A protein has these predicted regions:
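Surface-exposed beta-loop interaction hotspot
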Residues: 1-2
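Catalytic cores of peptidoglycan-degrading enzymes
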Residues: 6-153
Length: 154
């Protein structure tokens, strides 16, 4: 579905890396399954690539969220938004403003939590930035069968 490389949803500093440990009472309890970007309340959050908005909602931990299905099994999620600017079913473009940085859900302050899944697997969303823009169409092309050459052709 996408036709260009993925971009970061914000250009700000990353404050928490994918896979970093989460401590509770001095003990490692979980791993961080996304990337956190610094942001002031109300700053813009952009779609990482073209796609269809699969879900817009409000959840206890994640707060206001937008999920975008980019096709090919790739879905990105944007958590803790102060405001969502898209609706489920909308087609969004790469770089389109989809929401505003917030502090909704269980957070210590305003920021964007960016997450990604490939099929049923949670992946580091920063890895999407290195996917060639032609990956999806190249995978489809590899499945095509070439027609045999006519005999006697030189």
């Amino acid at each position: 579905m996408w036709t260009a490389s993925f971009i970061r949803p914000r250009t700000s500093v990353i404050t928490s890396e994918f896979g970093s440990g989460r401590l509770f009472n001095g003990r490692l309890t979980t791993r961080h399954l996304g990337v956190d970007f610094r942001g002031a309340l109300g700053e813009q959050v952009r779609a990482a690539n073209r796609g269809v908005v699969a879900l817009v909602g409000n959840f206890f931990l994640a707060g206001n969220v937008v999920y975008i299905d980019h096709g090919g099994g790739v879905v990105t999620a944007y958590f803790h938004l102060s405001k969502t600017l898209v609706s489920a079913g909308d087609t969004v473009t790469r770089g389109q403003v989809i929401g505003l940085v917030g502090a909704t859900g269980r957070v210590t302050g305003p920021h964007l939590h960016w997450a990604a899944r490939y099929g049923a697997v949670t992946v580091n969303p920063l890895d999407l930035l290195s996917i060639d823009r032609n990956w999806y169409s190249a995978a489809a092309a590899r499945k095509q069968v070439r027609a045999p050459q006519a005999s006697g052709a030189r």
